[in-house]
């Protein structure tokens, strides 16, 4: 580049920086956090072009190498990336709610271990009621678009969120979608993991539903400070089916994970995350453009047809009933019905 070109670039650089700063500021201004807003600011939101994001994050054991809030950290990142994508659309705003740290069914329930350090789950009926209550509040205030971001994979958990969303649709005519319960985004993540591994690694990872190479890689990418270095020596707990995972999780000293975390890497996590996040955002934007999410396959529905999953889910619901009975008995004894 000649001296004249250098002078032109030098002169334009501050202008370009200013323009980029303005665009970034405008985008950030379109992402609102309800906890920071007053009554008039919330009332002024255009209901037809405001998307409410409800991030969640079950506190769930993830074995000896990952934090109990692993799902929550992923949901926080997904929420931010989705918000950024939505406000790129002219006229659209995002209203972000504080993360709700509640969920149904830790992976420990796969082995019928309903008490497990690190898991602090709520009952199916509780989670459904929480999100139905929020659906009522949002629907009564005229909001039309609500996305729930709650990556946890337990079928009962996803059914609770799906049912709350269906209630919102049927009662208020809007859209409240359990985005992470739709299969297209989940399948993209699983496919990416398979493509990243050698045949030998795929055999070692097996059918892994929790805290495996896949999830450990994602946490190494997102929150490496919270991943214990000992994952590199983690012995595999490999299954080929959900029935295998039940048998593994029932063993006395099961550590809380499946598959082979030792295969994980931050580089793999970056690839997995980017592919999954891109597909997740793509599906959300398609829904805003008119795609009927109720015609898409849902994790909670598909797993009903798998006998091993049904066994786990039914046992979990029976445990829920037992817990509810204990609580109700105490309330009756205190005259608090």
Predicted regions and their residues:
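Extended, histidine- and acidic-residue-enriched regions that form the cofactor-binding/catalytic faces
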Residues: 28-146, 151-337
């Amino acid at each position: 580049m000649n001296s004249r070109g250098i002078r032109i670039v030098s002169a334009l650089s501050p202008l370009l920086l200013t323009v980029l700063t303005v665009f970034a500021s405008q985008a950030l201004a379109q992402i609102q956090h309800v906890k920071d807003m007053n009554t008039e600011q919330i009332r002024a939101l255009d209901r037809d072009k405001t998307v409410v994001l409800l991030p969640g994050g079950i506190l769930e054991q993830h074995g000896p190498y990952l934090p109990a809030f692993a799902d929550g950290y992923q949901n926080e990142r997904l929420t931010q990336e989705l918000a950024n994508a939505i406000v790129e659309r002219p006229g659209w705003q995002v209203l972000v709610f504080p993360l709700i740290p509640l969920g149904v069914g830790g992976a420990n329930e796969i082995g019928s271990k309903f008490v497990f350090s690190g898991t602090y789950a709520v009952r199916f009926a509780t989670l459904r009621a929480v999100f139905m209550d929020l659906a009522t509040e949002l629907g009564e205030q005229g909001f039309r678009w609500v996305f729930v971001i709650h990556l946890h994979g337990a079928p009962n958990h996803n059914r609770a969120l799906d049912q709350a969303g269906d209630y919102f649709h049927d009662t208020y005519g809007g859209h409240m979608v359990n985005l992470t319960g739709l299969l297209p985004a989940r399948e993209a993540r699983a496919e990416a993991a398979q493509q990243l591994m050698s045949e030998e690694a795929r055999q070692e990872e097996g059918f892994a539903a929790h805290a495996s190479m896949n999830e450990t890689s994602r946490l190494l990418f997102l929150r490496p400070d919270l991943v214990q270095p000992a994952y590199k020596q983690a012995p595999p707990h490999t299954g080929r089916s959900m029935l295998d995972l039940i048998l593994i999780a029932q063993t006395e000293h099961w550590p809380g994970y499946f598959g082979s975390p030792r295969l994980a890497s931050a580089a793999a996590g970056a690839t997995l995350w980017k592919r999954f996040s891109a597909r997740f955002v793509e599906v959300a934007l398609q829904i805003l453009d008119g795609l009927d999410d109720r015609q898409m396959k849902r994790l909670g529905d598909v797993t009903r047809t798998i006998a091993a999953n049904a066994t786990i889910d039914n046992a979990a619901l029976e445990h829920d009933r037992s817990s509810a009975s204990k609580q109700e008995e105490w309330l009756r004894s205190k005259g608090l019905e």
